[in-house]
Regions:
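Surface-exposed extracellular loop regions of Gram-negative outer-membrane beta-barrel proteins
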Residues: 313, 362-364, 413-422, 487-532, ...
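Periplasmic N-terminal accessory/gating domains of Gram-negative outer-membrane beta-barrel systems
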Residues: 75-77, 87, 111-203, 220
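Structural signature of Gram-negative outer-membrane beta-barrels, strongest in the C-terminal barrel
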Residues: 308, 400, 404, 408, ...
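Transmembrane beta-barrel wall of Gram-negative outer-membrane proteins
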Residues: 236-259, 275-313, 330-352, 398, ...
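Gram-negative outer-membrane beta-barrel transporters
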Residues: 449, 551-553, 576-662
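Flexible loop and strand-edge segments within Gram-negative outer membrane beta-barrel domains
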Residues: 282, 302-348, 352, 360-386, ...
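Outer membrane beta-barrel strand-and-loop segments of large Gram-negative receptors
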Residues: 387-391, 430-443, 521, 525, ...
């Protein structure tokens, strides 16, 4: 009996020893102290235990008191550390090099599944761009569920929503117009970017006022112990950055800026070939400027000030001809942002950030004509949006739950349209009324992780006061759950209820910055989106695969009755030009990623259908969305040809195959009734055939977006060289956009009895040189 009792005691002791122990910690960048997303925590045999979230946190259970693990992330040195149960530890990983690396597109999902993706600037350097610029906003375009707008542009349409339903934030500041030169590339200098997170489902509740996706760009913390800088040159831009300390380990700074070379290049070309051989004057400009000042007051308190701005301008003045009308066209847009923040971190488990920011986004379009007999006339249009906000965000950890909560107070000023009509110096300016709205929000969210499941939930309450002083209340929900079935296999589900308090009236579908932004009101209520996602994932240290399906329902959408209305001079107001409706989208998404070895890359495929329904459009019948692309296939690959201590060379190859977008086309002509007094008005004067045709012939159009353009096919190629010297690093990138020189159709039209195709881009080579010190 005594022996049996002893045996039970021994077994009880052993069972107690093998009971699962809880491990948790946080992983940061050693140089910038930024949280690292997607760092894998591996056993020494390579089995994955956990992956860090968008705050750099990880947690898991394992049946030992201490455990030796490997911390692994692309672009960082692997590190072996020892974890101890019940203790929250912080680790810092050393970047492989201080400069950005030329790597392929191998972003790290902040969680497994097709809903959250974290990445750094190094992860986007392999994407070929028209400007040759490293562009942090290019990465979302190669993910599943994302459809591109205009070829080469930055507009993207996520799971059936519009380009204006996305939200882009720079350190929590919304940036309404985040692109340069009609959307060719973003306004964010690559040197200022630390980690970025792109969310399509299970979205954080700390951000609101959108119904599609959230792109959060976090800037780097300036270096506190050394000075670093860069200079870069490409065909379109010249730029540089500098960072360092004013007081070592206390007061640090970073400045960065870029400017377009198109205007100097045009003037040089005109000088070389002769002014007489170039017709007109062409003046494109693009600039961006960034500055950050950080003061580490103590281990617990820090202050930060941020300044950001961008400016775009384009004008064309044709050559003057005798007795001919000359039209000067100009347009431009600006972004201005200021932010001051205080960060209080009394412990590793508690932080409070309070900030105030101001943003100003404005657009202008003008056309001035020198008519016959010296008559001058012009039309100028513009819009602007200003926002002032106060925000406080608390994060903490209670037992196994990571919690976040806060408040968000915003006041917005919209001026949707300003018109100035000028004839012979007499100006008639129509300042459309400014609309002031207020949004007060309270939010809370939490993440609970266990070995066999993880649950994330968030709630956001908004009190919205429209410009008519009408108050409405809305509650957003953000839910995500994952259930591992084995160590590598699992399932994930999300639900999101989202609300947006502004409408974006898109003109030409190119994703540029001249779309009209108008506030929600009693007549045009806030937009809502409900989205469900269910999928599975399989992941090893080298390979990950995700497959899932989504359904999204959108309400209170707005659209022009005719997109030509935005260019009309006879508009009473924008309210009379638009109508409201709803949309639906559903599809399957596949994401495959290889992360290790000399050959790395990714593949994404989307099979989807998206429709819109407006009572005043298409006879009230549902019709395909303009960017309802049934099939979207993106393949990215990178091969490391040379890797030594002083040299690196990489070959990148990317392929794109998608269904063409849809459009409405003319399908027939028929004879119309003769206009009243038409013969009288002709008065015996010979009328040009084209004018006669339009007066007596009518065109029948197809149903809305009934025609689908041919498939979009593109192949990009790139090669990069990197040389490390004692004090400087040189990097040369060569890329060829559209190697096949395929003329992909942007639209088709019928002219002079023939169908014609408009294509925007052919083959475009580019070179970018960069030096870092």
């Amino acid at each position: 009996m005594r022996g049996m009792l002893t045996l039970f005691l021994i077994l009880g002791f052993i069972a107690q020893r093998v009971e699962a122990q809880h491990y948790s910690g946080r992983i940061l960048d050693k140089e910038t102290a930024h949280a690292l997303v997607g760092v894998e925590v591996l056993t020494e045999r390579g089995h994955r235990l956990a992956r860090t979230d968008d705050q750099g946190l990880f947690s898991f259970d394992y049946p030992v008191d201490s455990l030796r693990v490997i911390l692994s992330a692309d672009s960082y040195r692997q590190r072996r550390v020892t974890l101890y149960s019940g203790r929250v530890l912080e680790f810092r990983l050393q970047p492989l090099q201080t400069e950005l690396q030329e790597v392929t597109i191998t972003g790290h999902g902040g969680t497994r599944g097709n809903n959250t993706f974290g990445y750094s600037p190094a992860d986007v350097k392999g994407i070929a761009t028209l400007a040759g610029e490293v562009d942090v906003m290019r990465y979302p375009q190669i993910l599943p569920g994302v459809s591109q707008g205009m070829e080469g542009g930055m507009g993207f349409y996520v799971r059936g929503a519009g380009n204006g339903n996305n939200r882009t934030e720079l350190d929590g500041i919304p940036i309404p117009a985040p692109t340069h030169l009609f959307g060719l590339f973003s306004i964010f200098h690559p040197d200022i970017v630390g980690q970025s997170t792109f969310q399509m489902g299970g979205i954080t509740a700390s951000s609101g006022d959108f119904t599609s996706s959230l792109l959060q760009i976090r800037t780097r913390r300036p270096s506190a112990r050394r000075y670093k800088g860069s200079f870069a040159l490409s065909p379109l831009m010249i730029g540089g950055s500098l960072e360092g300390y004013i007081t070592r380990d206390k007061l640090t700074f970073q400045v960065a800026g870029r400017s377009s070379l198109l205007r100097p290049e045009f003037l040089l070309l005109r000088l070389l070939v002769g002014k007489d051989n170039i017709s007109g004057d062409f003046n494109p400009q693009a600039q961006d400027l960034y500055g950050k000042l950080r003061w580490e007051i103590s281990a617990e308190h820090s202050l930060e000030a941020l300044l950001f701005g961008s400016h775009d301008y384009f004008s064309y003045l044709p050559e003057e001809e005798p007795n001919a009308e000359r039209n000067k066209i100009s347009l431009g847009w600006i972004n201005k942002a200021l932010k001051a923040s205080w960060l209080y971190t009394p412990s590793k488990h508690l932080s409070l950030e309070t900030s105030v920011y101001y943003t100003d986004c404005g657009t202008r379009q003008a056309q001035v004509s020198d008519g016959d007999w010296g008559v001058h006339k012009g039309l100028m249009m513009g819009s602007e949006k200003k926002e002032l906000a106060l925000r406080s965000h608390l994060t903490t950890r209670i037992h196994d739950i990571d919690l976040g909560m806060g408040i968000d107070l915003r006041q917005q000023h919209f001026r949707p349209m300003v018109q100035t009509l000028s004839i012979e110096g007499n100006k008639a300016r129509d300042w459309r009324p400014a609309y002031t709205t207020t949004i007060a929000s309270v939010f809370a969210e939490g993440v609970y992780r266990r070995p066999h499941y993880a649950v994330q939930g968030g709630i956001r309450y908004d009190l919205f006061r429209s410009h008519e002083r009408h108050i409405s209340h809305n509650i957003d929900l953000r839910l995500k759950g994952s259930l591992p079935l084995t160590r590598e296999l699992g399932v994930e589900a999300t639900y999101d209820r989202l609300t947006q308090y502004q409408h974006t009236l898109e003109g030409l579908p190119i994703g540029w910055s001249l779309d009209l932004i108008v506030p929600a009101s009693q007549r045009f209520r806030p937009e809502h989106a409900d989205q469900w996602y269910l999928g599975g994932f399989w992941s090893t240290p080298d390979l990950s695969v995700s497959l899932g399906g989504y359904y999204r329902h959108l309400t209170n959408l707005t659209a022009y009755r005719s997109w030509l209305n935005q260019f009309s001079l006879h508009n009473v107001s924008w309210e009379e030009d638009i109508t409201t409706g709803q949309g639906n989208s559903y599809g399957l998404e596949l994401w495959l990623e290889k992360r290790q070895g000399r050959l790395t890359g990714s593949l994404s495929y989307t099979l989807s259908r998206t429709t819109r329904t407006f009572s005043e459009l298409n006879g009230g019948q549902s019709y395909p969305f303009s960017f309802d692309r049934t099939h979207i296939l993106n393949v990215q690959s990178r091969y490391e040809t040379i890797h030594t201590a002083h040299r690196e060379q990489h070959l990148t190859l990317a392929g794109y195959l998608t269904s063409g977008n849809t459009m409405t086309i003319p399908i027939a002509n028929y004879q119309a009734e003769e206009l009243p007094f038409w013969n009288t008005q002709k008065g015996g004067i010979l009328v040009p055939p084209e004018q006669e045709h339009h007066a007596t012939t009518r065109t029948e159009m197809s149903t809305m977006n009934a025609y689908r353009l041919p498939p979009y096919i593109r192949l990009d190629l790139g090669y990069s060289f990197l040389w490390r010297r004692k004090k400087v690093t040189h990097e040369l990138g060569i890329s060829i956009y559209n190697v096949l020189n395929r003329r992909n159709p942007y639209l088709i039209f019928h002219e002079n009895g023939r169908w014609r195709q408009l294509s925007l881009l052919s083959i475009v080579p580019s070179v970018r040189w960069e030096i870092r010190f």
